[in-house]
């Protein structure tokens, strides 16, 4: 079962950057009721901050059940096909992440480990499908839109899951350096400026801590 206590407090959504607490809970409930291996990617992004391209490129060999960690060392994207003789204008490529910092190992929450154990298959199979066939990011984004619609949540970009993870993590008192490394960022400054969206409630809670000095 996915722990709702990890949802955190209500957040102020700026340009639909993150899910609200209510939306967060609705999405988790929907995934619990309808879970299949395709939806594991949503959990990896929402609870571990994994990018959509990284999610789509994952294979079961990237999951270490002994150390309960996930290895991120590749990403999938659709790019322009420069071959003039090619039938299609674009093609799917799987390559190393955009920066050295993006290559990382992330501890997997125990409830996700337990879900993974139920679907574990051959190491060369893709995580999202359990087969040799992958799901590309554009298709997975469309699948995510369907999940939102079926759970009654207003449309939001998949990348918002990563922003939601970062913001909830700060609210749960993650130290910023650990969070930055989990996200695969080049600097702590970038994490704070681009990925953390504190609510008025959270800011007030922090300000009230100053009362101890009165």
Question: Across the structure, where does each feature detected by a protein language model lie?
Answer:
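Short pre-functional
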Residues: 39-56, 69-70, 167-168
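Short, basic (Lys/Arg/His-rich) helix/loop patches that form interaction surfaces
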Residues: 25, 29-38, 48, 106, ...
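DNA/chromatin major-groove-contacting recognition/catalytic segments
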Residues: 30, 82-87, 193, 197-214
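Single conserved hydrophobic/aromatic residue that forms the stacking wall/gate
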Residues: 1-8, 13
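Long, amphipathic, Lys/Arg-enriched alpha-helical "connector/arm" segment
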Residues: 10, 14-37, 47-50, 58, ...
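Catalytic-site neighborhood detector that most strongly recognizes the C-terminal catalytic loop/helix
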Residues: 18, 76, 113, 183-208
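Conserved tyrosine-mediated DNA breakage-rejoining catalytic core shared by Y-recombinases
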Residues: 57-118
């Amino acid at each position: 079962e996915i722990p709702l206590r990890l949802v955190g407090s209500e957040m102020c959504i700026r340009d639909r950057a993150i899910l609200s607490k209510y939306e967060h809970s609705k999405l988790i409930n929907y995934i619990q009721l309808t879970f299949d291996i395709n939806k594991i990617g949503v959990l990896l992004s929402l609870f571990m901050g994994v990018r959509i391209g990284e999610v789509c490129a994952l294979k079961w060999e990237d999951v270490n059940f002994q150390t309960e960690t996930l290895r991120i060392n590749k990403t999938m994207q659709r790019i322009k096909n420069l071959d003039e003789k090619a039938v299609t204008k674009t093609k799917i490529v799987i390559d190393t992440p955009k920066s050295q910092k993006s290559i990382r190992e992330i501890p997997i929450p125990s409830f996700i480990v337990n879900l993974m154990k139920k679907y574990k298959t051959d190491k060369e199979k893709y995580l999202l499908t359990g087969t040799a066939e992958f799901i590309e990011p554009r298709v997975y984004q469309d699948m995510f839109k369907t999940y939102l619609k079926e759970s009654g949540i207003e449309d939001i970009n998949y990348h918002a899951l990563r922003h939601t993870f970062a913001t909830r993590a700060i609210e749960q008192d993650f130290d910023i350096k650990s969070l930055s490394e989990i996200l695969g960022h080049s600097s702590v400054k970038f994490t704070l400026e681009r990925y953390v969206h504190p609510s008025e409630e959270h800011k007030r809670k922090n300000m009230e801590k100053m009362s101890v000095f009165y």
